[in-house]
Swiss-Prot record:
Protein name: DNA ligase
Any one GO BP annotation for this protein: DNA repair
UniProt GO molecular function: DNA binding; DNA ligase (NAD+) activity; metal ion binding
Protein species of origin: Clostridium tetani (strain Massachusetts / E88)
Gene: ligA
Signal peptide positions on this chain: none
Length: 668
């Protein structure tokens, strides 16, 4: 065997090992090797592929590329992806069950080969983006696609490969299409928003936006997960029951949600619906209902389909936070980054116990894709108590409506707007009021310079009446200036002056966060300080040095480098330092012998002595990793009052549960 064949053999060997380790880590939640050992093998594979040019499509190195696509190609599914009919209440569910059981009894009366009375499989209805993954006769993932119309979707193969729990190769020799739901966990959502210049609004948008992003690097940053639940097309695999199909998916290494319940009647189904509704808010991801499907495949074939839906399955929808109302106008707002975004102004409507008058419209592409027009009736949806989003329009209401036009000039300073991808930006960073006001508010925020009492209204007063036109101008304000402002008396003026003075000695990580470096949130700022110790070291760090820091990839690293290349940024920092701002080192050495160093901790319930942010900071200062969900990798669950399902899961897994009192004793 020559040297190149030996290297090819080693590449095959490494791919098999690494894919096995990924399955154990992401699907089984039971890793058998350390991160260090995995990284060692991964680096060996990268080097061998680079040296030989021999790269297999199912290599783990192909999960994340530097690909930026120009468009999404259409893909025709081998078997239709059906929508599900919906039951909004138990009575509608009973009607569905009774209707099907009558059809089955009539079939059995007319045929010798009878069908069994149905049992029903209950699974969660995930609130993400449906994906259809095709594997060829060699078991290799060759296509990933969106649902689209159900017949034709969009090719998102590069994007789905970034989902680390998705197998790139399976031990199956038949052409097969596997369906699932790509989701963003709450943990991944929080972690992404810590670093994001423009935070995500909800989990569903996080998943859907990632998979429909032409820049695969952006998709990878979202750290998506997935659950698979159906085989839509198979040339060689036959199943007698749905449970048998699920067993096959598990055996092939697909991530399958452990909640799968078989029920024999409406009484058992009602009990399960109540159980899922009770634990819904404790889950690490969003669901919007339960899918109820007949288990027996032959029965499914007999029941067949309507024009729109399979008769053998139905979705029980939880009480929806959705409504229909009229779009009156669109308001264009400028953010801290200069991004100009549309907000819908609506006729008032009650939704989830709140009166809704405004809703999110992400950008012009979103407006065009959803066919949103002024005067149209629109569907709005509210998730996790955030500002609602327009999901689409009532087609019948489009007559006599008006097109929404993108502004050509900034709605505040009238500077010409520029297009960057799907977004509009105002480049007038020096005198565009909303940009400067929001920058001042961010700079003064608690996680940044912590200038107590400095609100957005105060920032607007400073801008309009004191001619504050830069961050540095904050430190030139005098008490007599403040006393000229409306509602500023002696005490309030003294408080603001003291707060500004006290902010001059921030933690270095807080100062870094206050600078508004794109993609650098609170955690990344701390990671930078922990690794580089000083501001100058961070400013002068190379791409290699930055990406060697855990959780910092090329996108964040490039953001840091490009930020500190800007002359006006360096001038602003120099100005702040000359005005007396003196950042101090804030990372203390972790005592290696503390009981939480290197451990994974989950916090649940309400603590008496700490807010969620405070306990997270405390644990991270002790060297712990704070996770949002309980798994076999969890070392401790810190439980406060009204601890929920995380407490129960910890009990099931035998994970040590500690009270707040025990925690305080352990750290002291």
């Amino acid at each position: 065997m020559d040297i190149s064949e030996e290297k090819k053999r080693r590449i095959h060997e490494l791919i098999e090992e690494l894919n096995k380790y990924a399955y154990e880590y992401y699907v089984l939640d039971n890793p058998t090797v350390s991160d260090k050992e995995y990284d060692k093998r991964y680096d060996e594979l990268v080097n061998l592929e680079k040296e030989t040019g021999f790269v297999l499509s199912y290599s783990p190195t192909q999960r994340v590329g530097d690909t930026v696509l120009t468009q999404f190609d259409k893909y025709t599914h081998k078997s239709r992806l059906w929508s599900l009919d919906k039951a909004q209440n138990i009575e509608q569910l009973k009607e569905w069950i009774n209707r099907n059981e009558k059809i089955i009894m009539e079939y059995n009366r007319l045929n010798e080969e009878t069908l069994p009375m149905p049992t029903y499989i209950l699974t969660k209805k995930f609130d993400g983006l449906t994906v259809n993954c095709t594997y060829d006769e060699s078991g290799i993932l060759v296509k990933g696609a969106t649902r689209g119309t159900g017949i034709i979707g969009e090719d998102i193969t590069s994007q789905v490969k970034t989902i680390k729990c998705l197998p790139l190769r399976i031990a199956n020799n038949n052409l097969i299409e596997v369906r699932g739901e790509a989701i963003m966990t709450k943990e991944a959502f929080d972690k992404y928003n810590e670093k994001a210049e423009i935070p995500l609004k909800n989990l569903r948008n996080g998943a859907a936006g990632a998979l429909r992003n032409l820049d695969v690097r952006e998709t990878a940053k979202r750290n998506l997960s997935a659950f698979f639940y159906d085989i839509g097309y198979s040339e060689g695999n036959e199943f007698k029951t749905y449970m048998e199909m699920i067993g096959f998916l598990i055996s092939m290494g697909f991530p399958v949600d452990p909640y799968i319940k078989e029920c024999k009647d409406i009484v058992e189904i009602k009990d399960e619906i109540k159980y899922i509704e009770d634990i819904r808010n404790e889950l690490n991801y969003d669901i919007d209902g339960i899918v109820i499907a007949i288990n027996h495949i032959k029965t499914r074939e007999v029941l067949g389909y309507t024009v729109k839906f399979p008769r053998w399955a139905i979705a029980y929808k939880f009480e929806a936070e959705e409504a229909t109302t009229k779009l009156i106008d669109v308001e264009w707002n400028v953010g801290r980054s200069g991004r100009v975004t549309p907000t819908a102004l609506l006729e008032s409507v009650e939704l989830g116990g709140a009166t809704i008058k405004r809703a999110t419209l992400n950008n012009m592409d979103d407006i065009i894709r959803k066919k949103v027009r002024l005067g149209a009736e629109v569907f709005i949806r509210r998730s996790n108590d955030v500002i609602p989003e327009i999901m689409g329009v009532v087609e019948s209401s489009l007559e006599n409506t008006e097109e929404i036009k993108a502004p050509l000039k900034c709605p505040y300073c009238e500077s010409k707007l520029i297009n960057e991808g799907v977004h509009l930006f105002c480049e007038n960073t020096l005198s565009c009021k909303p940009q400067l006001v929001k920058s001042l508010v961010h700079f003064a925020s608690r996680e940044a310079m912590n200038i107590e009492g400095f609100s957005e209204k105060t920032a607007e007063q400073f801008y309009e009446e004191l001619n504050i036109k830069s961050i540095g101008d904050l430190y030139r304000v005098k008490k007599e200036d403040l006393l000229t402002l409306d509602k500023f008396k002696e005490k309030k003026a003294d408080n603001i002056m003291n707060a500004i003075e006290n902010s001059k000695k921030p933690k270095l990580s807080s100062f870094i966060y206050a600078l508004s470096i794109p993609n650098v949130g609170v955690k990344t700022a701390r990671d930078l300080v922990k690794s580089f110790k000083t501001l100058d070291n961070i400013k002068n760090a190379t791409i290699e040095e930055l990406t060697s820091v855990k959780d910092i990839g090329e996108i964040v690293a490039n953001s840091v480098i490009e930020f500190f290349k800007q002359e006006n940024i360096n001038e602003s920092i120099k100005e702040l330092l000359e005005l007396g701002v003196t950042p101090i080192m804030d990372i203390t050495e972790i005592k290696k012998d503390n009981k939480f160093n290197g451990k994974t901790i989950v916090v649940t319930g309400t603590l008496e002595g700490y807010t969620r942010n405070e306990i997270k900071e405390k644990l991270e200062a002790l060297g712990a990793k704070v996770s949002g969900s309980v798994s076999k990798k969890t070392d401790f669950v810190l439980a406060g009052e009204e601890a929920g399902s995380k407490y129960n899961k910890a009990m099931e897994l035998g994970i040590r549960i500690i009270t707040e009192e025990e925690f305080n004793e352990m750290i002291n």
